Amino acid sequence: MAALSAPGLCGFRILGLRSSVGTAVQARGVHQSVATDGPSSTQPALPKARAVAPKPSSRGEYVVAKLDDLVNWARRSSLWPMTFGLACCAVEMMHMAAPRYDMDRFGVVFRASPRQSDVMIVAGTLTNKMAPALRKVYDQMPEPRYVVSMGSCANGGGYYHYSYSVVRGCDRIVPVDIYIPGCPPTAEALLYGILQLQRKIKRERRLQIWYRR
């Protein structure tokens, strides 16, 4: 009896295996039919619409980059500051212009007119009554223009921070590029600030930004 039941059991197993194989083949066919709707290795995907403008040619980028380097070299090598001495920091600014440090060797030449200047050195305490004059002189400077805040009083009010008549930082009136700490900062510190401004100008990419628009 046991010998007779073994072939029947094998038949049931074979039928069950066939049914499972048939179900797997049907499921595979369903998955293949769904997958063929989208892109596959044999069916290339359609290119998507680009929302960003195409990049310019490498030759144009190279020419504009070299022009930027040339303009930045000329600009940082001939900084003409507009002196705006307000307090004791101006004495150290004059010290930097003396023969000991000789700022002329860096191309820094003081100008008396804002029309001929591209840098303003705010040296000293800025009061509320002086703030409109500072802004007026800044507006008369041609673009591009830079501002150097020299000393603690120009940076944030300094010793007179809580005074009713003092502006707590000249960056509330004009945009500042370089801050020089100290009360007062030495001539070496101001010279270092000028060198940092030259490094900042060297990294500018004005023409490249204009070219990519």
Swiss-Prot record:
Modified residue annotations for Hydroxyarginine: R111
Transit peptide start-stop: 1-38
EC number assigned by the record: 7.1.1.2
Cofactor note: Binds 1 [4Fe-4S] cluster.
A GO cellular component entry from the record: respiratory chain complex I
Region Disordered, residue ranges: 32-53
KW Magnesium (keyword) present: no
Membrane topology: Peripheral membrane protein
Keywords associated with the record: 4Fe-4S, Electron transport, Hydroxylation, Iron, Iron-sulfur, Membrane, Metal-binding, Mitochondrion, Mitochondrion inner membrane, NAD, Oxidoreductase, Respiratory chain, Transit peptide, Translocase, Transport, Ubiquinone
Cofactor(s) in the UniProt record: [4Fe-4S] cluster
Binding site for [4Fe-4S] cluster: C88, C89, C153, C183
UniProt catalytic activity: a ubiquinone + NADH + 5 H(+)(in) = a ubiquinol + NAD(+) + 4 H(+)(out)
Comp. bias regions, Polar residues: 33-44
GO molecular function, one term: quinone binding
PROSITE patterns the UniProt entry points to: COMPLEX1_20K (PS01150)
GO biological process, one term: mitochondrial electron transport, NADH to ubiquinone
Coiled coil: none
Main location: mitochondrion
Post-translational modification: Hydroxylated ar Arg-111 by NDUFAF5 early in the pathway of assembly of complex I, before the formation of the juncture between peripheral and membrane arms.
Compartments where located: Mitochondrion inner membrane
Assembly and oligomerization: Core subunit of respiratory chain NADH dehydrogenase (Complex I) which is composed of 45 different subunits. This is a component of the iron-sulfur (IP) fragment of the enzyme.
Function: Core subunit of the mitochondrial membrane respiratory chain NADH dehydrogenase (Complex I) which catalyzes electron transfer from NADH through the respiratory chain, using ubiquinone as an electron acceptor. Essential for the catalytic activity of complex I.
Membership in a protein family: Belongs to the complex I 20 kDa subunit family.
Protein name: NADH dehydrogenase [ubiquinone] iron-sulfur protein 7, mitochondrial
Lineage, opening ranks: Eukaryota, Metazoa, Chordata, Craniata, Vertebrata
Gene transcribed to yield this protein: NDUFS7
